[in-house]
């Protein structure tokens, strides 16, 4: 028994790497040997693929249609959508879309269930039979044949040995009738019978194995059809799913499109302005000049011509975004952006840069570069004029409009610091750039050089705008914006900016109103208290130099300054001011300079009074006896000038009509009443004002 097992192990060790065995090789031809080698790989492939396909199934394997659909994730998604759209308005866009999505998910779940059931029937079950039944049966016959052949070979060896032993015993002189000879002969006969029986079994098993191999060869094509059928089932599943999705999407888009074209939605639909070609934009809106160009130019003409660094300083991103949105949605509501010229300039640059094709066109790029490379000014101007004539009509009209505006902007370069060169640097790359080409570093360097030439082209266009684009231009082409002329804007700016801060002009000669009644003593005391409070709170400053201006030119600035220096009125004092001791005396008044008493000469206003908290008194001030004179500090005990308008004896009150007139003049100018009253009163000869001693001012302060 041990010898037989050892012989069996030796036979298994002699089996080739290709699966060939010496027991079966002698019964198979070369073709059947190759078929035999494909049995084990085919069995492993069928088993592994069946296992992975089974894992791809989403439903319950082997269940009927309804149970399988309930277990699918798509059906769970459909159920969730059905529960969700019940809480929404069924007439809303979201409710309709969710309802349609719920229905299509349910349909897709049923298609998936049908796909899985077909896959199980046509692919999974045949692969399972192949890997679990058919191929294992063939391999089982192979193993049986190998065992029978091995046993047959062993039996033949024993028979051969027994026959040899029987012949050797006869050769040694044993009689044929002896017991040992009889026993050996019986053994040989028994082995021959066993060998013949085993040979018959080997031949029978061999025939069965060969039949299995031939059957496998004939069925091998059908086994390959399992995988073809898998792809067909998948294609049919995806085709049905796609058809259902296309139908649902068409219906959903149709319903959603009707909702978009409803009156409420149409009211909020605005045409695109930025990022659209110039010709398309002008055709859609029926304009001659692009809306962003005209709107930004009109706003800049209104507020931004004197803004320093215009087009160079960047604006806030949020303001710029809101301006661009308002430009497309409601161009009539752009007034709020007029106060931010940098945002308006940024919107104009953004529009020019976002054009699909530059305003000066790609086709004429090389022509612009050649014109800019000319050194002689006359030839360059002629070349630029020729290139301009070749522009499309809509590009030419918009370029002419823009260059006229930029030339107007350059006229204010003393204030806004934007020379034609500076304007060309910031706007040139937005008006012309080369077509995009994939290239090496040399082409990139050439592009940077061309940008410098573009700046030269735009600068020449700005400088020669009147020559290249002759004739006047109406910037308010569409009439959509309020026509604000540059001259009005400049005069308004000058009136508000050129405000003298060191002089009070002579009031305009207007008809004087009726003389006011004589003031009561209380106002005089109030004026004196106000003056003393002002002198005690504010330290003295040296007198400012005079600035001589004609009355018509300076009336408006003074009024504007008085308006800007208004402060809350101080509280009225309830008691008279303290009196200065009589030991103090005033020095003699210096002689007046020639021409200082003329009505047309403005008098200096102390700088400390500008921006102070002084307000006009609530009662009319006393009429001054003399025209305005240079402000001089005066002793508190200096005699007051006699006034014909004040009744009664002259009072030694510190509220005299020299310095108090200076104090009240600035305050009264804020109310607009005092200067006119002063100019209409006859001026009798007056005592010159006495300067206030420096020692007295220091003691008082």
Swiss-Prot record:
Residues 508-522, 570-579, 587-596, 618-630, 641-652, 682-692 have a biased composition (Pro residues). Residues 1-275 are annotated as: Interaction with CGNL1. GO terms for molecular function: GTPase activator activity; semaphorin receptor binding; SH3 domain binding. Keywords: Cell junction, Cell projection, Cytoplasm, GTPase activation, Nucleus, Phagocytosis, Phosphoprotein, SH3-binding, Tight junction. Residues 276-469 form the Rho-GAP domain. GTPase activating protein (GAP) which specifically converts GTP-bound Rho-type GTPases including RAC1 and CDC42 in their inactive GDP-bound form. By specifically inactivating RAC1 at the leading edge of migrating cells, it regulates the spatiotemporal organization of cell protrusions which is important for proper cell migration. Also negatively regulates CDC42 in the process of actin remodeling and the formation of epithelial cell junctions. Through its GAP activity toward RAC1 and/or CDC42 plays a specific role in phagocytosis of large particles. This is SH3 domain-binding protein 1. It comes from Homo sapiens (Human).
């Amino acid at each position: 028994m041990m010898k037989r097992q050892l012989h069996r192990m030796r036979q298994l060790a002699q089996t080739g790497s290709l699966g060939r065995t010496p027991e079966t090789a002698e019964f198979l031809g070369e073709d059947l040997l190759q078929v035999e080698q494909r049995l084990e790989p085919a069995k492993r492939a069928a088993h592994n693929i069946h296992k992975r396909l089974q894992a791809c199934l989403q439903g319950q394997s082997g269940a009927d249609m309804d149970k399988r659909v309930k277990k699918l994730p798509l059906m769970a998604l459909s159920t969730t959508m059905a529960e969700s759209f019940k809480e929404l308005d069924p007439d809303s866009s979201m409710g309709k879309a969710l309802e349609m999505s719920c229905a299509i998910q349910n349909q897709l779940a049923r298609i998936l269930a049908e796909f899985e059931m077909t896959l199980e029937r046509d692919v999974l079950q045949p692969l399972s039979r192949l890997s679990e039944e058919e191929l294992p049966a063939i391999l089982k016959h192979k193993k049986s044949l190998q065992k029978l052949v091995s046993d047959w070979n062993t039996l033949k060896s024993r028979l051969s040995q027994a026959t040899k032993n029987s012949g050797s015993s006869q050769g040694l002189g044993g009689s044929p009738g002896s017991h040992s000879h009889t026993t050996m002969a019986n053994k040989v006969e028994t082995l021959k019978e066993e060998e013949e029986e085993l040979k018959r079994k080997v031949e029978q098993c061999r025939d069965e194995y060969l039949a299995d191999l031939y059957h496998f060869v004939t069925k091998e094509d059908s086994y390959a059809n399992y995988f073809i059928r898998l792809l067909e089932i998948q294609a049919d599943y995806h085709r049905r799913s796609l058809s259902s999705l296309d139908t649902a999407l068409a219906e959903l888009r149709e319903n959603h499109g009707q909702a978009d074209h409803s009156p409420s939605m149409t009211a909020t639909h605005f045409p695109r302005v930025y990022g659209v070609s110039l010709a398309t934009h002008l055709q859609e809106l029926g304009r001659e000049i692009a809306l962003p160009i005209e709107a930004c130019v009109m706003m800049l003409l209104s507020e931004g011509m004197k803004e320093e660094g215009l087009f160079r300083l960047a604006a806030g991103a949020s303001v710029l975004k809101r301006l661009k949105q308002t430009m497309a949605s409601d161009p009539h509501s752009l007034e709020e952006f007029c106060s931010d010229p940098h945002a308006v300039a940024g919107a104009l640059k953004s529009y020019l840069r976002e054009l699909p094709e530059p305003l000066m066109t790609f086709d004429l790029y090389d022509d612009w570069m050649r014109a800019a490379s000319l050194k002689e000014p006359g030839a360059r101007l002629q070349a630029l004029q020729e290139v301009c004539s070749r522009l499309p009509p809509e590009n030419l009209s918009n370029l002419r409009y823009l260059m006229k505006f930029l030339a107007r902007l350059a006229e204010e370069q003393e204030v806004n610091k934007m020379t034609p060169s500076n304007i060309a640097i910031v706007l040139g790359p937005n008006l012309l750039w080369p077509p995009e080409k994939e290239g090496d570093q040399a082409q990139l360097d050439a592009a940077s050089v061309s940008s410098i030439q573009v700046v030269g082209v735009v600068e020449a266009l700005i400088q020669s705008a009147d020559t290249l684009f002759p004739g006047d231009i109406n910037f308010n082409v569409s009439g959509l914006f309020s026509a604000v002329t540059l001259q009005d804007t400049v005069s308004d700016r000058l009136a508000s900016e050129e405000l003298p801060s060191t002089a009070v002009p002579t009031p305009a000669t207007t008809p004087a109103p009726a003389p006011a009644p004589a003031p009561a003593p209380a106002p005089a005391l109030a004026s004196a208290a106000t003056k003393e409070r002002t002198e005690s709170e504010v330290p003295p400053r040296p007198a400012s130099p005079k600035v001589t201006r004609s009355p018509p030119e300076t009336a408006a600035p003074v009024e504007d300054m008085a308006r800007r220096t208004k402060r809350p009125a101080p509280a009225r004092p309830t008691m008279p001011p303290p009196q200065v001791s009589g030991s103090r005396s005033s020095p003699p008044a210096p002689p007046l300079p020639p021409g200082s008493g003329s009505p047309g000469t403005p008098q200096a206003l102390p700088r400390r009074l500008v921006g102070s908290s002084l307000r006009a008194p609530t009662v009319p001030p006393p009429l001054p006896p003399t025209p305005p004179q240079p402000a001089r500090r005066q002793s508190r005990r200096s005699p007051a000038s006699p006034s014909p308008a004040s009744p009664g004896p002259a009072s030694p009150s510190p509220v005299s009509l020299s310095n108090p007139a200076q104090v009240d003049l600035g305050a009264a100018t804020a109310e607009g009443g005092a200067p006119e009253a002063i100019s209409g009163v006859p001026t009798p000869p007056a005592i010159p004002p006495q300067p206030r001693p420096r020692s007295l001012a220091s003691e008082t302060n």
